Amino acid sequence: MGQSTETKEMIADYMENGFLNDIIDMFKNDRRLFTFLGGLIADERSRVRLGTVALVEELREMYINEIARAIPDIAESLNAVNPIIRADAAYLLGVINHKNALPYLSKAVNDENPLVREAVEETIAFISDLSEEIGTN
Protein backbone atom coordinates (compact mmCIF):
# COMPACT_ATOMS: atom_id res chain seq x y z
CA MET A 1 0.00 0.00 0.00
CA GLY A 2 2.86 2.40 0.76
CA GLN A 3 4.18 2.14 -2.80
CA SER A 4 0.79 2.87 -4.36
CA THR A 5 0.17 5.80 -2.00
CA GLU A 6 3.55 7.24 -2.90
CA THR A 7 2.84 6.78 -6.61
CA LYS A 8 -0.54 8.51 -6.33
CA GLU A 9 1.01 11.42 -4.45
CA MET A 10 3.78 11.71 -7.03
CA ILE A 11 1.20 11.80 -9.84
CA ALA A 12 -0.84 14.42 -7.96
CA ASP A 13 2.26 16.55 -7.36
CA TYR A 14 3.22 16.32 -11.05
CA MET A 15 -0.35 17.25 -11.97
CA GLU A 16 -0.29 20.27 -9.68
CA ASN A 17 2.95 21.41 -11.29
CA GLY A 18 1.52 21.19 -14.80
CA PHE A 19 3.22 18.05 -16.09
CA LEU A 20 0.05 16.68 -17.70
CA ASN A 21 1.78 15.37 -20.83
CA ASP A 22 4.21 13.37 -18.69
CA ILE A 23 1.30 11.93 -16.71
CA ILE A 24 -0.55 11.02 -19.90
CA ASP A 25 2.52 9.09 -21.04
CA MET A 26 2.75 7.36 -17.65
CA PHE A 27 -0.88 6.23 -17.87
CA LYS A 28 -0.38 5.00 -21.45
CA ASN A 29 2.61 2.94 -20.34
CA ASP A 30 1.09 1.53 -17.14
CA ARG A 31 -2.64 0.90 -17.21
CA ARG A 32 -2.62 0.06 -13.50
CA LEU A 33 -2.38 3.81 -12.86
CA PHE A 34 -6.04 4.23 -13.82
CA THR A 35 -6.87 2.93 -10.34
CA PHE A 36 -5.65 6.29 -9.01
CA LEU A 37 -8.34 8.36 -10.77
CA GLY A 38 -10.64 8.23 -7.73
CA GLY A 39 -7.94 9.54 -5.42
CA LEU A 40 -6.89 12.24 -7.86
CA ILE A 41 -10.39 13.70 -8.25
CA ALA A 42 -10.67 13.72 -4.44
CA ASP A 43 -7.51 15.81 -4.04
CA GLU A 44 -8.04 19.16 -2.30
CA ARG A 45 -5.86 20.92 -4.89
CA SER A 46 -7.98 22.31 -7.73
CA ARG A 47 -5.13 21.98 -10.24
CA VAL A 48 -4.96 18.25 -9.52
CA ARG A 49 -8.70 17.83 -10.07
CA LEU A 50 -8.60 19.93 -13.24
CA GLY A 51 -5.64 17.90 -14.48
CA THR A 52 -7.51 14.69 -13.73
CA VAL A 53 -10.40 15.84 -15.92
CA ALA A 54 -7.95 16.78 -18.70
CA LEU A 55 -6.24 13.39 -18.35
CA VAL A 56 -9.53 11.53 -18.74
CA GLU A 57 -10.56 13.73 -21.68
CA GLU A 58 -7.29 12.88 -23.39
CA LEU A 59 -7.37 9.12 -22.72
CA ARG A 60 -11.11 8.35 -22.73
CA GLU A 61 -11.39 7.08 -26.29
CA MET A 62 -8.42 4.75 -26.18
CA TYR A 63 -8.76 3.52 -22.58
CA ILE A 64 -12.49 3.57 -21.85
CA ASN A 65 -12.44 0.12 -20.22
CA GLU A 66 -9.72 1.09 -17.76
CA ILE A 67 -11.44 4.40 -17.01
CA ALA A 68 -14.85 2.74 -16.59
CA ARG A 69 -13.39 0.38 -14.00
CA ALA A 70 -12.43 3.47 -11.95
CA ILE A 71 -16.05 4.74 -11.81
CA PRO A 72 -16.79 3.30 -8.32
CA ASP A 73 -13.67 4.95 -6.88
CA ILE A 74 -14.44 8.25 -8.59
CA ALA A 75 -18.04 8.05 -7.38
CA GLU A 76 -16.84 7.88 -3.77
CA SER A 77 -16.03 11.58 -4.12
CA LEU A 78 -19.74 12.28 -4.59
CA ASN A 79 -19.81 11.87 -0.78
CA ALA A 80 -16.84 14.16 -0.04
CA VAL A 81 -17.22 16.84 2.62
CA ASN A 82 -16.12 19.54 0.17
CA PRO A 83 -18.98 20.37 -2.24
CA ILE A 84 -16.52 21.47 -4.92
CA ILE A 85 -14.99 17.99 -4.93
CA ARG A 86 -18.49 16.47 -5.13
CA ALA A 87 -19.33 18.67 -8.13
CA ASP A 88 -15.98 17.93 -9.80
CA ALA A 89 -16.57 14.20 -9.35
CA ALA A 90 -19.98 14.52 -10.99
CA TYR A 91 -18.42 16.47 -13.85
CA LEU A 92 -15.69 13.85 -14.30
CA LEU A 93 -18.31 11.11 -14.45
CA GLY A 94 -19.96 13.12 -17.21
CA VAL A 95 -16.67 13.33 -19.10
CA ILE A 96 -16.34 9.56 -18.78
CA ASN A 97 -19.91 9.32 -20.08
CA HIS A 98 -20.54 5.71 -19.18
CA LYS A 99 -23.88 4.28 -18.07
CA ASN A 100 -22.20 2.56 -15.10
CA ALA A 101 -21.97 6.00 -13.46
CA LEU A 102 -25.75 6.49 -13.41
CA PRO A 103 -26.54 4.52 -10.21
CA TYR A 104 -23.94 6.53 -8.27
CA LEU A 105 -25.18 9.81 -9.69
CA SER A 106 -28.80 8.91 -8.89
CA LYS A 107 -27.87 8.57 -5.22
CA ALA A 108 -26.37 12.08 -5.28
CA VAL A 109 -29.27 13.83 -7.00
CA ASN A 110 -30.59 15.21 -3.69
CA ASP A 111 -27.28 16.67 -2.53
CA GLU A 112 -27.63 19.47 0.01
CA ASN A 113 -25.58 21.83 -2.18
CA PRO A 114 -27.40 23.37 -5.16
CA LEU A 115 -24.26 23.48 -7.33
CA VAL A 116 -23.62 19.79 -6.72
CA ARG A 117 -27.25 18.96 -7.49
CA GLU A 118 -27.01 20.91 -10.73
CA ALA A 119 -23.78 19.14 -11.74
CA VAL A 120 -25.29 15.75 -10.93
CA GLU A 121 -28.53 16.46 -12.79
CA GLU A 122 -26.70 17.75 -15.87
CA THR A 123 -24.40 14.73 -15.89
CA ILE A 124 -27.30 12.30 -15.58
CA ALA A 125 -29.10 14.04 -18.46
CA PHE A 126 -25.96 14.06 -20.59
CA ILE A 127 -25.17 10.37 -20.07
CA SER A 128 -28.82 9.36 -20.52
CA ASP A 129 -29.27 11.44 -23.68
CA LEU A 130 -26.09 10.20 -25.28
CA SER A 131 -26.83 6.59 -24.34
CA GLU A 132 -30.24 6.84 -26.00
CA GLU A 133 -28.76 8.56 -29.05
CA ILE A 134 -26.15 5.92 -29.80
CA GLY A 135 -27.83 2.99 -28.08
CA THR A 136 -24.72 2.03 -26.12
CA ASN A 137 -22.46 2.92 -23.19
Q: Over which residues does each language-model region extend?
A:
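Amphipathic alpha-helical scaffolding segments comprising HEAT/armadillo-like alpha-solenoid repeats
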Residues: 2-6, 28-42, 61-77, 98-110, ...
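Short, mixed-charge aromatic SLiMs
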Residues: 76-84
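Structural detector for internal amphipathic alpha-helices that build alpha-solenoid repeat scaffolds
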Residues: 8-29, 47-65, 84-98, 118-132
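Short inter-helical turns and helix N-cap capping residues of alpha-solenoid HEAT/ARM repeat scaffolds
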Residues: 44-45, 81-82, 112-113
